[in-house]
Amino acid sequence: MKLLTTGLLASAALVAAQEQQVLRADEVFGKAPLPDASIFDETIKQFQSSIEDGISHFWSEMKTNFKDYLPMISLPKKHNRRPDSEWDHVVRGADVESVWVQGADGEKRREIDGKLKNYDLRVKSVDPSQLGIDPGVKQYSGYLDDNDADKHLFYWFFESRNDPKNDPVVLWLNGGPGCSSLTGLFLELGPATIDKNLKVVHNPYSWNSNASVIFLDQPVNVGFSYSGSSVSDTVAAGKDVYALLTLFFKQFPEYATQDFHISGESYAGHYIPVFAAEILSHKNTNINLKSALIGNGLTDPLTQYPHYRPMACGDGGYPAVLDQGTCRSMDNSLERCLSLIETCYSSESAWVCVPAAMYCNSAILAPYQQTGMNPYDVRSKCEDMGSLCYPQLNAITEWLNQKSVMKALGVEVESYESCNSGINRDFLFHGDWMKPFHRLVPSVLEKIPVLIYAGDADFICNWLGNQAWTEALEWPGHKKFTEAKLQDLKIVDNKNKGKKIGQVKSSGNFTFMRIFGAGHMVPLNQPEASLEFFNRWLRGEWH
């Protein structure tokens, strides 16, 4: 769904602990027992001798104040795996990997590239009448299994409402990291939402209006996914996504011939460059990747972090949330923040990337969160921090936890939660947050178009920062893209033709959009506008 603020809380907590030396870690991270970190003492001691004073001091404070939380891992979910006989289809990765064909040069090669032998895909045909979601629309759910690593990723597929034999296929990924893509399904762009009475409500602006959509709960231990192990960085998750798509299209070759697009929001700004690059790295594949879409993403922190102060202090098109004194304090902290991020970019080591995330989030992002305003929409207060400021999530979570729903989908875990804060901490404490995944975008742009869109009322991944990193990105089309002017984006597809919904600039394979009146989740706040640009993008406009 969104960039979780758990990282901000952890960062702010560390700063408070440095000042007061009284803050208890269990009050910040919860009371679940975790392994003792004494094994890290010697490692940290040795490392401190080779790093700069600021970073060394940070790790000393971490070891003192959060000793029990350094070896952070997300806890496994209770689950009960169903036998293969209860599934409608089971696709063996080993079978796919064993198929060889003769190429045009007469040489034998594998039909499909990639390390697939450890993966299986289990498929259940979902009866729409049981759930009341899009009756008449074909649906599948199931799990991608990495049997060696004991990882099981849940997915839910909805065929296009329009022309499934010809319409493209889209993968949707929520962010967090650690938020279920089913939040995107029911809160934003899927075929239905859930009201406060737990009734299914049809969504006329669903993205499966003209495309088939796969919603994937990843990484493991998110949503209905589960594992006895954990994934704590973006790159590891990329291999799983490639395997899922490969086996899905192998089972359903009728979709493999159609255009495929990968999309997502928030921390998917990390995921999508990696996942797209992984897919494009394979020469022989059944994934017909045509474009990538990132909404309100975190992709290039070094370029994006300077734009938090302007967005919070009245320079982003909305009234200031913070007072002038707090804004000056953020300005004063920025130089050190950027220096830490630059060091992270140079080494990409957790030892330096974690301090960058902790310091920058506490100094640059946390002041906004402490106001009680919604970090995902500067126009409103946070109604319920427990539901990430969106109380609608409570009904969605309750509906998905019904035994009848779980049975209809073939779910193997005991419960569902919209976001797993443990996953968020895993990624944060492994240094993933600040890594420069934007460096993969130029190679992606060489092969496919990329759309960066941003609701202009979001703070946490705001439009100022997203426009800035797209214009700063070094790639062959940089000069022309930077010189391109923002043009009005208007509706052309329905009765509201001519209505202004945002601004767009495009050159070559790169496009940036600012969507008016939308927060972090554009399809939630502006469903008509989101379906408008989505359909036009899939048709090839702007690229």
UniProtKB/Swiss-Prot annotation:
Cited InterPro entries: AB_hydrolase_fold, Peptidase_S10, Ser_caboxypep_ser_AS
Gene Ontology BP terms: proteolysis
Sorted UniProt keywords: Carboxypeptidase, Disulfide bond, Glycoprotein, Hydrolase, Protease, Signal, Vacuole, Zymogen
EC number: 3.4.16.5
Signal peptide: 1-17
Catalytic activity, reaction form: Release of a C-terminal amino acid with broad specificity
Record-linked Gene3D superfamilies: 1.10.287.410, alpha/beta hydrolase
Annotated propeptide span(s): 18-124
Keyword field contains Mitochondrion: no
Domain of life, per lineage: Eukaryota
One Pfam family named in its UniProt record: Peptidase_S10
Active site location: S266, D458, H520
Tagged with keyword Hydrolase: yes
GO cellular component assignments: fungal-type vacuole
Disulfide bond residue pairs: C179-C419, C313-C327, C337-C360, C344-C353, C382-C389
Molecular function, one GO term: serine-type carboxypeptidase activity
Glycosylation sites: N210, N509
Subcellular location: Vacuole
Function noted in UniProt: Vacuolar carboxypeptidase involved in degradation of small peptides. Digests preferentially peptides containing an aliphatic or hydrophobic residue in P1' position, as well as methionine, leucine or phenylalanine in P1 position of ester substrate.
Family from the record: Belongs to the peptidase S10 family.
Protein name: Carboxypeptidase Y homolog A
Organism: Arthroderma gypseum (strain ATCC MYA-4604 / CBS 118893)
